[in-house]
């Protein structure tokens, strides 16, 4: 195992996504929240989110995470897949993570134009969000969450 692989394993071992919520960015109202560690690789996670989230112009995502390890440039790359085809890609950067810290990170996710939106009945169960967790260019973990609109 290379030093990079070992470093990625160390970071992942000490990393935990404690909770996450999604809010309507305009009203601040929480639409969904969960405490499952959605960063765990190797399993397909599931999230049941309300259909009305698709009507929001923007969604505010709040992540609370703990890290035993220091990270120089913690960042996420996310891809939204519909039936295996990538529809959207997002990039988020947190930056420096203090070792043995718990942090809350808020990000704004802008919705696709309404003309490009598919109905919840078509999307439900067919959307997977793939999240890659990085420390700068070092891939730490890849997780997948299947969305169900309820």
From Swiss-Prot:
Annotated keywords: Cell projection, cGMP, Cytoplasm, Cytoplasmic vesicle, Cytoskeleton, Membrane, Sensory transduction, Vision
MF GO annotations: GTPase inhibitor activity
Pfam family, one: GMP_PDE_delta
Compartments it resides in: Cytoplasm, Cytosol; Cytoplasmic vesicle membrane; Cytoplasm, Cytoskeleton, Cilium basal body
Annotated InterPro entries: Ig_E-set, PDED_dom, PDED_dom_sf, Rhodop-sen_GMP-Pdiesterase_dsu
One CC-aspect GO term: cytosol
Keyword Membrane part of the UniProt annotation: yes
Tissue expr: Detected in retina photoreceptor cells, especially in rods (at protein level). Detected in retina, brain and adrenal gland.
Biological process terms in GO annotation: visual perception
Membrane-topology descriptor: Peripheral membrane protein
Superkingdom as given in the UniProt entry: Eukaryota
Residue span of region Required for association with membranes: 144-150
Recorded family membership: Belongs to the PDE6D/unc-119 family.
Function: Promotes the release of prenylated target proteins from cellular membranes. Modulates the activity of prenylated or palmitoylated Ras family members by regulating their subcellular location. Required for normal ciliary targeting of farnesylated target proteins, such as INPP5E. Modulates the subcellular location of target proteins by acting as a GTP specific dissociation inhibitor (GDI). Required for RAB28 localization to the cone cell outer segments in the retina. Increases the affinity of ARL3 for GTP by several orders of magnitude.
Oligomeric form and interacting partners: Interacts with the prenylated catalytic subunits of PDE6, an oligomer composed of two catalytic chains (PDE6A and PDE6B) and two inhibitory chains (gamma); has no effect on enzyme activity but promotes the release of the prenylated enzyme from cell membrane. Interacts with prenylated GRK1 and GRK7. Interacts with prenylated INPP5E. Interacts with prenylated Ras family members, including HRAS, KRAS, NRAS, RAP2A, RAP2C and RHEB. Interacts with RAB13 (prenylated form); dissociates RAB13 from membranes.
Protein name: Retinal rod rhodopsin-sensitive cGMP 3',5'-cyclic phosphodiesterase subunit delta
Organism: Bos taurus
């Amino acid at each position: 195992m290379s030093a990079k692989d070992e470093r990625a394993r160390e970071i992942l071992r000490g990393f935990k996504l404690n909770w996450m919520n999604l809010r309507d960015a305009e009203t601040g109202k929480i639409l969904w929240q969960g405490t499952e560690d959605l960063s765990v690789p190797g399993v397909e996670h599931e999230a049941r989110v309300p259909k009305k989230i698709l009507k929001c112009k923007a969604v505010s995502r709040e992540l609370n995470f703990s890290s035993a390890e220091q990270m120089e440039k913690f960042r996420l790359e996310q891809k939204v897949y519909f039936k295996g085809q990538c529809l959207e890609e997002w990039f988020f950067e947190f930056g420096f993570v203090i070792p043995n810290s718990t942090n809350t990170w808020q990000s704004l996710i802008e919705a696709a134009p309404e003309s490009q939106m598919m109905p919840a009945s078509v999307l439900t169960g067919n959307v997977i969000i793939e999240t890659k967790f990085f420390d700068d260019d070092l891939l730490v973990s890849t997780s997948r969450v299947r969305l169900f609109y309820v």
